[in-house]
Amino acid sequence: MNNSKLTSVKILEDLYKRFKATTVNTKMTLQKLTNRSIDLYLMDENYKNTIETHDNLTASGSNL
């Protein structure tokens, strides 16, 4: 992937554990989910609104 950008983000530990458990026997990775989510966010107004209004996360001191 020559056109990729290395970055780091903080992810809620419980969400990450649940994601890993859910995807353990699939080909879905956090990188795939992130890239697809960003693409949908930029291309799909309904998805963007869903993400921007989602407030079902527990605050942990980071920008959720």
Q: Where are the regions that the model predicts?
A:
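Short Lys/Arg-rich basic patches
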Residues: 1-11, 20-23, 28-31
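Active-site micro-motifs of SAM-dependent methyltransferase domains
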Residues: 17, 40
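Short, positively charged interaction helices/loops
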Residues: 43-64
